[in-house]
Amino acid sequence: MGFNINIIGTGGTRPLHNRYLSSVLIEYNGDNFLFDCGEGTQMSLRKQKISWQKIKMICITHLHADHITGLLGIVMLMSQSGETRKDPLIIAGPVGIKNYTKNNIDMLKIYTNYEIIYKEIIIDKTEKIIYEDKTKKIEYTRLKHSIECVGYLFIEKDKPGKFNTEKAEELNIPKGPIRKTLQDGKEILINGKIIKPSEILGKSKKGLKVAYITDTGYFKELIQQIKNFNLVIIESTFKNELKKEADKKLHLTAGGAANIVKQAKVLQTGLIHFSERYTLRKDLENLLKEAKLEYPDGEIFLTKDGMRLEANKNNFIIK
């Protein structure tokens, strides 16, 4: 339970023996949300002892192979774990995600014993919120890549302040569901008097905001979308010396990624989606150095396969 982030993979293009393709799983009070699902994702999930059966929603950024080729394996395994899945699986992504998944399920005769709900995103037309419940919501944001691509914003809703029991007794508010109504942020009527939540509840606690951003070139609109986020996991595909190649392929350098989060005043930044050419630890450390040179006041770190981050007040602690 709680609010945790698991780094499933950190690479780009193809999986390496020590680095799977970029994928992140967010756990929130028993609900699991998987972002991207490249080749080998199920292997990394197994290594980290994370059950694919508990995945509520899979959000795909775009239809390039290194972000989607592991999806069908997860879909298949959910019907082969010895237990029947009770809840539907939600699969979200840009236009084409439904045809890709359904056509392959039919062609490969993949058996599924559960419902799949598709949420195709028509960029700038589809409602920004693609998932929402009482405690959280997920929004998409347009990215700048060679094909239609989106980033995802996982937003924890503000938590109500502490319930003032003494004040409730003073106002003759009976125990039970009516107090819960106030805690849910709704007004109540007692003896002809309207009582607002603000009269009973203390100051609310701001929810945490997490963004998953890959693949994209630099563009100003993104800065506003992730303004003041608690954590942004963002691609850092190339070293600064390869900026021309990054710009051509619509990817980010380490310095480019840091420049975006610096302008957005992001509290914590995790670098991800490392080029396959960077196989040595010192190569990755150089990416980190370049990012920190651009944003020396920011808290920037390298994500690593198997890393786990746990929410702690206004930030996340690496475990």
Swiss-Prot record:
NCBIfam families in the record, alphabetically? PRK00055.1-3, RNase_Z
| Family membership noted in the UniProt record | Belongs to the RNase Z family.
- Entry cofactors: Zn(2+)
The UniProt entry annotates the active site at: D66 (proton acceptor)
Cite the source lineage. Bacteria, Pseudomonadati, Spirochaetota, Spirochaetia, Spirochaetales
Q: Which residues form a coiled coil?
A: none
Free-text cofactor note: Binds 2 Zn(2+) ions.
**What's one Pfam family here?**
Lactamase_B_2
**Top-rank lineage group of the source organism:** Bacteria
- Physiological role: Zinc phosphodiesterase, which displays some tRNA 3'-processing endonuclease activity. Probably involved in tRNA maturation, by removing a 3'-trailer from precursor tRNA.
Q: Which HAMAP family match?
A: RNase_Z_BN
Tell me what organism the protein belongs to: Borreliella afzelii (strain PKo)
Q: Spell out the protein name for this chain.
A: Ribonuclease Z
How does this chain assemble?
Homodimer.
